[in-house]
Amino acid sequence: MPQYRGDMATCGFIEYNDASPEVRAVYDDIMTTRQTDWINNFWKALAHHPPTLRRTWESIKQIMAPGALDPLVKEMIYVAVSATNQCPYCIASHTASARKAGMTDAMYAELMAVVGMANETNRLASGYQVDVDDRFKT
């Protein structure tokens, strides 16, 4: 039986040495792709259901790969959505990634101001049930 650890995680974490070959393969791909020697807790928690682990990793790997948006923009979007969804883990992990990609304290502060304002005005527009202007319709 795998050894689990994690004070907050519902099911605990599956460490590399305790992982099945299927889970280890995903862990190895994560470490290779990210050029790191460790697996963060999010993946260790998802490892309890290997199909979800693999599907989520493959999707994130594709979405976060080089594209029209640069890595900093993608991480800042992740921080914004994570703040709105109130996910402390995601806020912390993606803030660290955004800082690694070049986000400054000033950029973070401005991002949080935009997130706060967007959430407020979204709630106001929803509460007032504002019809979309014809000019904004696509």
Task: Identify what each model region corresponds to.
Residues M1-T138:
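Hydrophobic alpha-helical segments
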